[in-house]
Amino acid sequence: MKQMSVVADSPVHSSSSDDFVAFLDNELGASSPDSSPDKEAESQDELESVRIKRRKIESIDETEGSTSEGIIKQNLEASVEVDVCTHPGSFGSMCIRCGQKLDGESGVTFGYIHKGLRLHEEEISRLRNTDMKSLLGHKKLYFVLDLDHTLLNSTLLAHLSSEESYLLNQTDSLADVSKGSLFKLEHMHMMTKLRPFVRSFLKEASKMFEMYIYTMGDRPYALEMAKLLDPQGEYFNAKVISRDDGTQKHQKGLDVVLGQESAVLILDDTEHAWMKHKDNLILMERYHFFASSCRQFGFNCKSLAELRNDEDETDGALAKILRVLKQVHCTFFNKHQDDLVDRDVRQVLSSVRSKVLGGCVIIFSRIFHGALPSLRKMAEQLGATCLTEVDPSVTHVVATDAGTEKSWWAVKENKFLVHPRWIEAANYFWEKQPEENFIIKKKQ
Amino acid sequence: MFFHIVLERNMQLHPRYFGRNLRDNLVSKLMKDVEGTCSGRHGFVVAVTGIENIGKGLIRDGTGFVTFPVKYQCVVFRPFKGEILEAVVTMVNKMGFFAEAGPVQIFVSNHLIPDDMEFQSGDMPNYTTSDGSVKIQKDSEVRLKIIGTRVDATEIFCIGTIKDDFLGVINDPATV
């Protein structure tokens, strides 16, 4: 009881070491009253017998001393722990470090890793820092992937158009998902088509990145899709984030990703989901395999499924993006000798991006006002120079109509006259597209 | 720790079960109701082992349901602070690892893993000592000490540590 009270008091004192020494002396003295100094004054005659006796007593003292010391130490440790423990996180409302029950929910939830797990900001940044070092040591970066329209396309069975119903007979077996690409998920009333090249894409990307899935779908859907993409659980093990795990509604954020923002690449088809992390984003051309998906985005054209067509396996969007990833990865790790930790993948990404349309001088002609600023920004990010007045240095005139003054000028001066889609395509594929595919037809 | 204790419960039974098999019905319903549940006081009910006594039923007005007070013996499992448990690792990540001992979910954070063990990422994430002699990965069996417990209606959460003498891996699946 005495010890307890001392320990309870100890936090009050600012410097506890002196107190502790006094306390220790006191305790040790109290526990070994037999070894008092007057024993030293025994006469020489009795030395022999006393020595034996002393030895006995000493050995008792020693054990007593060490046990009481042990108790003190333990108590001290406990008290220090209670004082020092910053409660870096919680699991089932208990501190993950000291086991103490914590009331009130604070920190960021990491439900996608394990139910009931929460971590505090400092702990997250500590984990990010330590992880960063080992990751860079393995020459890897982080990669956050979206599911729908990026890696695959899903539709409700009820939304299949009549021209698509033939697909029902062509679905692949769920017994070995690693071979197929079209799956019917009866219990979810859904059909899912994986984007061509996705398996090679993930395999290649996993060598360069630690990968996360981040989807706006709900958790059961996200896990089901992860199972289709990664049946062995080798890429996305406990790294599947769904909308239930995000911290903000209708937004995706890197706060739940345990990776430093300067080392994260994102692949998504929806730019506005990543308002805070646009610099990390690689925008993906949407994959619309099913008609319901086309309708959802307001396209009236036939779906790939209706046309019985699909993206190219070796030269589709994913294959093109993989080349960009390889380039970014290579640039990041091969850059001159500055410290790896100080490098920022966002800078690498923007420098790679700015070479796409490098050397192009663009002038816009009669582009719809609402679309102009974003188009101009896109072109500038891709490295093109945008002018407002006609100039001999202009290489491309971007217009939707061949009848404008600038369009005439382009034809006369033998400059490229292209549709705005030329810029958009370059933005998606990270490659200057052949201009002849984007020629504007004369209006009748 | 396991305990063999006597608990009591009021069982509501639908009139359709009245008849010759009333007792059997009552017992099977009891098992269905309580086995696998948790209570903060007693822990996880592993199995009903016997019926001590079934009291007189009370017919409820209006519904015809009958309430029987049932005293039953059962085996319960409850982890305690300071208890040493053996558990199977279910997940390893940079924050630490999760392990299971029956219904109990235990988290051992990397603060409570010995400092000489380092996290190794990859398709089989693990914690390994610098000389590679000890490895904790999924399906490893570990001996750990409980430093905190919380019992919910259906789950028991524990915080564990292996930063102490004689704790850690007891059976490594990789070497078997």
UniProtKB/Swiss-Prot annotation, chain B:
Keywords, sorted A to Z: DNA-directed RNA polymerase, Nucleus, Transcription
Source species, domain of life: Eukaryota
Subunit (UniProt): Component of the RNA polymerase II (Pol II) complex consisting of 12 subunits. RPB4 and RPB7 form a subcomplex that protrudes from the 10-subunit Pol II core complex.
Alphabetical list of PANTHER family matching this protein: DNA-DIRECTED RNA POLYMERASE II SUBUNIT RPB7, DNA-DIRECTED RNA POLYMERASE II, III
Primary role: DNA-dependent RNA polymerase catalyzes the transcription of DNA into RNA using the four ribonucleoside triphosphates as substrates. Component of RNA polymerase II which synthesizes mRNA precursors and many functional non-coding RNAs. Pol II is the central component of the basal RNA polymerase II transcription machinery. It is composed of mobile elements that move relative to each other. RPB7 is part of a subcomplex with RPB4 that binds to a pocket formed by RPB1, RPB2 and RPB6 at the base of the clamp element.
Protein name: DNA-directed RNA polymerase II subunit RPB7
Species per Swiss-Prot/TrEMBL record: Glycine max (Soybean)
Major localization class: nucleus
Protein location: Nucleus
InterPro entries: NA-bd_OB-fold, RNA_pol_Rpb7-like_N_sf, Rpb7-like, Rpb7-like_N, S1_domain
